[in-house]
């Protein structure tokens, strides 16, 4: 994408995606410090939210915590299902940009009425119902998003949870300037027109790879930005039965694929189904590859940015309004004060 080209610059979505580079560079990792003692006191952390406020921020935090291997237990679930859980021994973070997502507010009402004393909010607005019920709330600095599809807020939410993980591990959160440059490059790099044509004409776009939240978030963004059907195939799910109903008019995007499984994927999907397979990766793969820089411990942010770039190109090629989906709403399910 190119903000100096009118076919991109007319969309707030493109502007907000590109703003993430400065947001990353200027992020203050100390913002999570004041929450750490309460989390450690509980000994467990539960991250809830709906849609984009949970998928990448929460799941990436869990992935990183498991990679480190020595942190307290961290879990995530949507707020409605979380009503069925005993969260009394967890510090609970509820993420909602509006601060008035119905499911989050309802969960916090229940927990607060039961005497829960470790409820925390993560929002983009002050003076919200969520903030009024939380013991403490961090308000994002990214500013209001004009496009329906959340982008820069997703990145800042993830950075905030990332800072929680670093604090809990007693590690410094370094390298954000380099990450900013890598994300910027991923957002601006040219994508081969042949790839975009294949994706533009695909009946379904599948995303396959690690359960870090990045790929699942791209699956959601495919619906909002391109209006195309999509599905997230976690891990090696792509090799375990779904090939039975796949079609040659569909495309799979592998994000940083497991090298050990590439030959089997080629056998099952390319040769067996006859479908197109594309990869987004920091290395050359067995498939047509959108090459990105290796982001190290922050690599999932670079993957997400590259995926955004692809989705914008598809949307522009389809000639649709990237900012305003027909049915999707900025606040999916709003809490109404009675």
Task: State where each predicted segment sits.
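Glycine-rich phosphate-binding loops that contact phosphosugars or nucleotide phosphates
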Residues: 29, 33, 38-184, 188, ...
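Hydrophobic, well-ordered secondary-structure elements that form the walls
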Residues: 310
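Flexible, glycine/charged-enriched surface loops at secondary-structure junctions
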Residues: 14, 172-176, 232-233, 319-326
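N-terminal amphipathic/basic leader segments beginning at the initiator methionine
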Residues: 1-24
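Glycine-rich phosphate/diphosphate-binding loops and the adjacent beta-loop-alpha structural elements
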Residues: 6-13, 44-50, 200-214, 220, ...
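Active-site rim loops that border cofactor/substrate pockets in soluble metabolic enzymes
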Residues: 220-251
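ATP/pyrophosphate-binding catalytic subdomain of soluble kinases
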Residues: 179, 187-231
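A short, charged, Gly/Pro-tolerant segment at domain boundaries
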Residues: 321-338
């Amino acid at each position: 994408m190119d903000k100096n080209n009118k076919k991109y610059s007319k969309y707030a979505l493109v502007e907000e995606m590109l703003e993430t580079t400065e947001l990353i560079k200027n992020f203050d990792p100390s913002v999570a410090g004041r929450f750490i003692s309460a989390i450690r006191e509980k000994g467990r952390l539960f991250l809830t939210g709906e849609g984009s406020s949970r998928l990448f921020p929460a799941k990436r935090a869990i992935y990183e915590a498991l990679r480190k291997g020595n942190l307290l237990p961290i879990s995530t679930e949507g707020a409605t299902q979380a009503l069925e859980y005993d969260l009394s021994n967890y510090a609970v973070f509820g993420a909602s940009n509006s601060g008035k997502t119905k499911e989050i507010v309802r969960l916090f009402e229940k927990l607060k009425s039961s005497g829960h004393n470790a409820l925390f909010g993560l929002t983009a607005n002050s003076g919200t119902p969520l903030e009024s019920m939380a013991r403490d709330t961090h308000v994002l600095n990214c500013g209001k998003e004009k496009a329906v599809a959340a982008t820069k807020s997703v990145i800042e939410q993830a950075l905030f949870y990332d800072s929680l993980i670093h604090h809990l591990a007693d590690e410094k959160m370094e390298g954000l300037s380099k990450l900013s440059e890598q994300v910027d490059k991923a957002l601006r790099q040219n994508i081969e027109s042949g790839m975009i044509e294949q994706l533009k004409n695909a009946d379904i776009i599948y995303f396959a790879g690690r359960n870090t939240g990045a790929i699942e978030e791209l699956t959601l963004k495919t619906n909002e930005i391109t209006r195309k059907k999509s599905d997230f195939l976690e891990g090696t799910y792509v090799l375990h039965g779904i090939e039975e109903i796949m079609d040659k008019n569909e495309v799979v995007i592998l994000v940083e694929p497991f090298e050990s499984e590439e030959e089997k994927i080629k056998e099952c999907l390319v040769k067996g189904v006859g479908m197109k397979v594309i990869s987004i990766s920091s290395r050359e793969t067995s498939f047509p590859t959108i090459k990105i820089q290796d982001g190290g411990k922050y690599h999932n942010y670079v993957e997400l940015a590259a995926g955004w770039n692809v989705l914008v190109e598809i949307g522009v090629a389809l000639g649709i309004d990237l900012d305003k989906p027909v049915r999707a709403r900025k606040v999916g399910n709003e809490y109404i004060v009675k």
